[in-house]
Amino acid sequence: MTIQSIVENELVDDGHSVWLLNDHREFGYSDGAESEQYLDKVFRSAKDLSSRSSELEGHIKDWPSEYHLTSKRSQLLSGFTFDRSSRVLAVGCGCGAITRFLGETFDSVVSIEGSINRARLARLRTRDLDSVSIVCAPFQKIRFSQKFDIIFCIGVYEYSGWFVDGQDPYDAVLRYFADLLAPDGIVVLAIENQFGLKYFSNSREDHLGTMFEGIEGYHRHPGRVRTFGKVELESNLRKYFPCVEFYYPYPDYKLPDCVVSGQFLASQRAGELVSQSKSRDYSGPRQVFWDESTAALE
């Protein structure tokens, strides 16, 4: 199926094989012009764009480039078995690291990104994959003619308060996903843990760069961006999805060393494995007050 047959809105090609809504308006999320220009240069010159590309990893020079170029991004999903024929929607594709893996794994992927610069980078990363269509638009404005078997929302849900209007944007996003899901379909959602161990010790909140912001309830920056603990997240999800299953990437979903099931996490074997994963403060250097790996064993 073509993207025009899947999306009911009028679409226009921006000249870079990215599809735009006819009334496209720019979304201002960015890692910065310098970072995006660097990725553009790397992707254009790369011969191996795959999700496991050591060539791309050789161009890592800082945290933004590591996030977009490391093969660890795909490790979040590579341990799961998927049906290749599943109809897939990816919401918030960024610069294409996860979308690249999805395009290698599925025959049909529609990936949405609000920023035109990041959407073009995602298209460059997936330029050899005919299975992938990149649409630059606010996802909630797109009307689809089909349901999806799997919806991936990786590192996006926490920004709902930023780009979705309404009294409860986090609820609105989940309701949108539920309406788009085929019978027996699934939503794969990855988000940081509001009460992650590193936040009680020596790390600033990943999005806002403020110590203890999440564990104190985001009262300094209400309505901008927020993560959730397991209890609240599960409560949100069960309003629309009766079956909720948790998996735990360590140290986090961004750069996972391993992904374990809830059942394994409850076993006596889990502590030794997850204690080997070292968390990071992505805002910069941190002072270590106590050993997280030892605490994980407890």
Spans of features found by a protein language model:
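Conserved SAM-binding loop of SAM-dependent methyltransferases across substrates and taxa
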Residues: C95-F106
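Class I SAM-dependent methyltransferase SAM/SAH-binding core
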Residues: T105-V132, P138-Q140
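Conserved class I S-adenosyl-L-methionine
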Residues: V188-M211
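A short acidic, Gly/Pro-enriched loop at the edge of an enzyme's catalytic core
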Residues: R143-I151
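Rossmann-like AdoMet/SAM-dependent catalytic core
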Residues: E232, P249-E298
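A short glycine-rich, Lys/Arg-flanked "PGG" loop and its adjoining helix->strand segment in the class I
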Residues: D168-I186
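N-terminal auxiliary segments of SAM/dcSAM-dependent transferases
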Residues: M1-D48
